Amino acid sequence: MATKEEHVRKPDWLKIKLNTNENYIGLKKLMRENRLHTVCEEAKCPNIHECWAVRRTATFMILGSVCTRACRFCAVKTGLPTELDWQEPERVAESVRIMNLKHVVVTAVARDDLKDGGAAVFAETVRAIRRKNPFTTIEVLPSDMGGVYENLKILMDARPDILNHNIETVRRLTPRVRARATYERSLEFLRRAKELQPDIPTKSSIMVGLGETKEEIIEAMDDLRANHVDILTIGQYLQPTKKHLKVVKYYHPDEFQELKEIALSKGFSHCEAGPLVRSSYHADEQVSEAAKARQLKA
């Protein structure tokens, strides 16, 4: 058993093949030329080479690259945020057009310094993508916007195809993992989103390996279903730097398969679970048939 000073050894199934082909290089160049940020880079996502080089997909991160929070699992920079860039929505939309994306995920740093939490720019990004890419489905992944539900309404009024907000971990560990958020506020955020737009699927994600129990994971599933969440992703927590929380346990792929089966039995319409699964990993495959049909009617 590992001591507090030791790291739990990373298993072989978490080894990643790096791929820096023309797609990868081209996408990186496109992001830099348009002064855009991706959570793929900023959060040190383990799937960046697969998504960029093979699938040619990316998750755009708007509202700058500096977060006002300092969650202990996240590699995104924290500190004083940058000024709002109202040209950013159009640049994102144009990049989506150039990439010819069928599904796009837009996330953002937390902007607790803004009265609307960045909702206006977020909503305009959705509308800009829709104008230039009418057949692209759009998934948004906002922070809890400080629990100000008028801000959530601004975003939901833009009619994204999926509203994704992550609880990240189980109830007991939330104060330690993300001190400036609360478990209950995230659940309420998801519930309010469904109340505002009942036909828009909602989605959330749980990291495992932080010291939670199986029973706590199942309790989190029940809490999400009680708040009408449709889609769930479950992935392995990986420590981005030595300053972040250490991994307590690496889950075996068979354990992820079991969690997926439990989630589906709870009534989630879709569950993606695996060691390298992240909230936006294979997000294009998670779009419900209802969301696709609604988009085609637009």
UniProtKB/Swiss-Prot annotation:
Cofactor annotation: [4Fe-4S] cluster
Compartment list: Cytoplasm
GO molecular-function terms, A-Z: 4 iron, 4 sulfur cluster binding; lipoate synthase activity; metal ion binding
Similarity comment text for this entry: Belongs to the radical SAM superfamily. Lipoyl synthase family.
Keyword field: 4Fe-4S, Cytoplasm, Iron, Iron-sulfur, Metal-binding, S-adenosyl-L-methionine, Transferase
SUPFAM superfamilies according to UniProt: Radical SAM enzymes (SSF102114)
HAMAP family referenced in this protein's UniProt entry, alphabetically: Lipoyl_synth
InterPro entries documented for this protein: Aldolase_TIM, Elp3/MiaA/NifB-like_rSAM, LIAS_N, Lipoyl_synth, rSAM
Enzyme class: transferase
Pathway(s) served: Protein modification; protein lipoylation via endogenous pathway; protein N(6)-(lipoyl)lysine from octanoyl-[acyl-carrier-protein]
Catalytic activities: [[Fe-S] cluster scaffold protein carrying a second [4Fe-4S](2+) cluster] + N(6)-octanoyl-L-lysyl-[protein] + 2 oxidized [2Fe-2S]-[ferredoxin] + 2 S-adenosyl-L-methionine + 4 H(+) = [[Fe-S] cluster scaffold protein] + N(6)-[(R)-dihydrolipoyl]-L-lysyl-[protein] + 4 Fe(3+) + 2 hydrogen sulfide + 2 5'-deoxyadenosine + 2 L-methionine + 2 reduced [2Fe-2S]-[ferredoxin]
Organism: Geobacillus kaustophilus (strain HTA426)
Residues where [4Fe-4S] cluster 2 binds: C67, C71, C74
Protein name, as recorded: Lipoyl synthase
